């Protein structure tokens, strides 16, 4: 198990349907974005599940990770630069900053 507040971005690749149901992902809001680059500010830790697309995420500390359809991503609070390579559609959920909320 990982704690993204101490390790940065955490990715669980190709998440199973059982895992998605366990987390209640399909009840989370949906966010869509087209190809391009933008910087997002996160006030709290966010979990995202990519329904479609591909992107590269870069945190302000320089950590970079590629994500794609089927990945569950935990993004720590702070500045994150999104470079979207293929249109992204994702479910997301923000959490208060407490270690227990964010363990994958």
Description of each model-found segment:
Residues 1-23:
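N-terminal non-globular leader segments, chiefly Sec-dependent signal peptides
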Residues 14-16, 24-43, 76-77:
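Conserved short histidine dyad/triad with adjacent acidic residue
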Residues 39, 47, 63-65:
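Short, surface-exposed secondary-structure edge patches
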Residues 42-57:
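Short, conserved beta-strand element in jelly-roll/cupin
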Residues 49, 66, 74, 83-84:
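Well-ordered beta-strand positions
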Residues 61-78:
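Short acidic-glycine-tyrosine-enriched beta hairpin
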Residues 77-102:
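Ligand-binding loop in jelly-roll beta-barrel domains
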């Amino acid at each position: 198990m990982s704690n993204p507040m101490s390790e940065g971005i955490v990715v669980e690749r190709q998440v199973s349907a059982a895992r998605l149901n366990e987390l209640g992902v399909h009840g989370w809001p949906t966010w869509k974005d087209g190809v391009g680059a933008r910087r997002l500010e996160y006030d709290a830790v966010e979990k995202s599940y990519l329904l479609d697309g591909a992107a590269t995420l870069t945190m302000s500390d320089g950590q970079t990770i590629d994500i794609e359809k089927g990945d569950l991503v935990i993004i720590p609070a702070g500045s994150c630069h999104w470079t979207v390579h293929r249109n992204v559609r994702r479910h997301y959920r923000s959490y208060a900053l407490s270690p227990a909320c964010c363990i994958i």
